[in-house]
Amino acid sequence: MLNQLRPALVLLVALTAITGLAYPLAVTGVAGALFPAKAAGSLIERDGRIVGSSLIGQSFTGECYFHGRPSATTAADPADASKTVAAPYNAANSAGSNLGPTSAALAERVKGDLAALKAENPGRPVPVDLVTTSGSGLDPDVSPEAALFQVPRIARARNLPEDRLRDLVAGQLQGRTLGLLGEPRVNVLALNLVLVDLAKR
């Protein structure tokens, strides 16, 4: 019986070592050598400190900043661990809300967001990504339309010409990956960092 088990055990140990240790270490080493910034998390550094990642969205709420998509991520309620509370862009709990199209709670949230955005920019259609969450709740990008929609609010808050802000958006525009995958987009963190630099001048 031991003769029959030995090949299976040897194969189990060998495949575990190859697929669980050697392969991940090799891929990590190659990624670190070829793409060091991406392998380290695509972190963005300013003045010697890390301010975020280009892959994970952040919550910007001030009137003078570009805002990302709504985030449905949650965290444990400090008062009652059996419940959750809203925690936008919580990377430790990446998920959507799982609210379906017939959900009254979802309809109420979208209605409130739409009303606020229409009041901010009357007469203009609200881009859909400013009222819908992504599947992960951590989307770092918005559509060019969503970024441009916010220009009048930021121009008023910062006392800047709208044309200058539109130029900033155009400068941060990323096209489709490989020319055909995904949609054109603007990274909100990168755009806000450029905006802060502009305000310092």
Curated annotation (Swiss-Prot):
One Gene Ontology molecular-function label: P-type potassium transmembrane transporter activity
GO cellular component entries: plasma membrane
Subcellular location(s) per record: Cell inner membrane
Topology of this chain in the membrane: Single-pass membrane protein
Pfam families: KdpC (PF02669)
Transmembrane segments: 7-27
Keywords assigned: ATP-binding, Cell inner membrane, Cell membrane, Ion transport, Membrane, Nucleotide-binding, Potassium, Potassium transport, Transmembrane, Transmembrane helix, Transport
Keyword DNA-binding: no
NCBIfam families reported for this sequence: kdpC (TIGR00681), PRK00315.1 (NF001454), PRK13999.1 (NF010603)
The protein's assembly and partners: The system is composed of three essential subunits: KdpA, KdpB and KdpC.
Family of the protein in this entry: Belongs to the KdpC family.
Function per UniProt: Part of the high-affinity ATP-driven potassium transport (or Kdp) system, which catalyzes the hydrolysis of ATP coupled with the electrogenic transport of potassium into the cytoplasm. This subunit acts as a catalytic chaperone that increases the ATP-binding affinity of the ATP-hydrolyzing subunit KdpB by the formation of a transient KdpB/KdpC/ATP ternary complex.
Name of the protein in its database record: Potassium-transporting ATPase KdpC subunit
Organism: Methylorubrum extorquens (strain CM4 / NCIMB 13688) (Methylobacterium extorquens)
